[in-house]
Amino acid sequence: MQAIILAAGMGRRLGEFTADNTKCMLEVNGVRLIDRMLTQLSSIDLDRIIIVTGYEGEKLRKHILSCFHNLNIVFVDNPIYDRTNNIYSLWLTREYMKEEDTLLLESDLILDDSILQKAINAEYPNVALVAKYHTWMDGTMVRIDDEHNIVNFIPKKSFRYEDVPYYYKTVNVYRLRKDFCRDHYLPFLEAYIKVLGENEYYEQVLRVITLIDTANIKAVPIDARWYEIDDVQDLRIAETMFASPEDRLRKLQHSFGGYWRYPGLLDFCYLVNPYFPQKRMIDEMKANFEPLLRDYPSGMGVNSLLAGKYFGIKQKYVVVGNGAAELIKALMEELDGKLGVIYPTFEEYPNRRDNDSLVKFHPANDDFSYTADDLMAFFSDKDINSLLLVNPDNPSGNFIPFADMLRLVRWAEETNIRLIVDESFVDFSDGGFSNTLLKNDLLEALPSMCVMKSISKSYGVPGLRLGVLASADDKLIARLKKDVAIWNINSFAEFYMQIFGKYEKDYARACDLFREERANFHKELNEVSGLRVVPSQANYFLCELTGSMTAHDLALRLITDYNILIKDCTAKKGFPDGKQYIRIAIRDRKDNHALYEAFRNILR
């Protein structure tokens, strides 16, 4: 058996990264693609490896010969690489393909070590490795039947999103018998080039053979890691996928989202309602996708109107943000004097302030719990102008009930302290909507109070980036509206607010379902040895590790062995040295049980 690697392409989409080298000379985590591939091939009993070079071919040949002198490597040059595609590169190897069975690979692949053995050990004579379609995949797709026959090759121009559930992506790894190449593939390859030219793809020939039903090529599905690197984003994703466990965890944590790029990842780090929006609302959003994509959104005036309708408060009291983060930044920059903060907290607020302007309260217990009376007692003799309260708190889940909140906000009003209440998680609390301060009479009676709410978290739409701040302080609201851009909300977010009223009952039911699941999950977690669960009124649990395992080591085990991402809190401000805390989101029953089982296996 021989291997053929196609490595003539220019890799234009990679820009500066391929300015003076071909794609397979790119490094992923310090290892060149071609080095990784040749190392993997060296473990297989191959008579020779044929590499088709083209763009910057001399550099590639010199590098390979200096590093892999123990391999029998044959180079084939494609001198017209700049005006041909891989169909011509493969055609240049036709005589070799007649002589031996071939393992055919593209050079821009990064593959798990197990993948090539899948092709070598497949029971069928001719195989194409395929993977179930995911959104990152581009290029040739196939459809297969129940017996793994490839019934069609689908080129990019024939791709139909409505057929995505049936698609598999070709991994661009094939094992082809020499008789198949000699009697079927190469004659069609020659005819195809003569009729359609050299700037095509070799998969098109397989498609033609399949359509006339003379092919004997089977699909072998894989679920191991692999990636095809065509642009700089692909390069970054590949670096994350194939990083060491430690580096992979760090890269995922520093991405701050975008985890759809990593199929199968269970995200217990970010905090989103698992039960809303439901299918009917999503279908309405989909049905209006094209006009929302093509039309400009409204300005701040209309969006304030929609947000007021959304929460049942007056338009003039509301400013809408591109996520609560935009409003947090604007508000923190607006406030004068010192700010009271309860630690540990959601650090987006204090990170927007000078440390010297912060007056910090640290609850003196392992649950980080506190009451309204605790806050009034601590801050009553402190020289603060504003007090921040996240209720329920993040990350502790501590909750001050509504009656006590009223005492606290009135105390703040009487002592000339502006109280900033972030109630992004209040809908998850027992009592739900009855605990909100987003009420006209309260805002008017307590005009210095500011209420912040992230729509992303409670309502399960973080991709829309929506948040609101409400206050009856008309001068503050006017300054904040002036500070944010007129078109700070996109059309999809605006339309979501526009139609939400039709789905309010669904949202209420979703919150009820969530509270039931929180109770179930809490009961499960309490069964895990070495894990102390802090009571929570939010959509997450803060947990202390009471055994020998550190939070970092647990996070590492979960991402490595279970593809589960959690929040390691040990580096957050406000946690005592030596204590090990994690925060885990509460998802649906299936996902929560998967995490519970992982905990049981690791922490036993």
Name these PLM-found stretches.
Residues 1-60:
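N-terminal glycine-rich phosphate-binding loop and ensuing alpha1 helix
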Residues 168-170, 278, 299, 448-527, ...:
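PLP-dependent aminotransferase class I/II
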Residues 112-196:
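Conserved core of the sugar-phosphate nucleotidyltransferase
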Residues 68-140:
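Conserved beta-loop-beta/alpha segment of the NTase-like Rossmann-fold superfamily
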Residues 237-295, 382-383:
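N-terminal "arm"/small-domain region of PLP-dependent enzymes with the aminotransferase-like
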Residues 515, 528-562:
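Conserved PLP-binding catalytic core of the aspartate aminotransferase-like
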Residues 118-122, 369-383, 395-458:
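Active-site pre-lysine segment of PLP-dependent enzymes
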Residues 277, 403, 560-561, 566, ...:
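PLP-dependent enzyme catalytic core of the Aspartate aminotransferase-like
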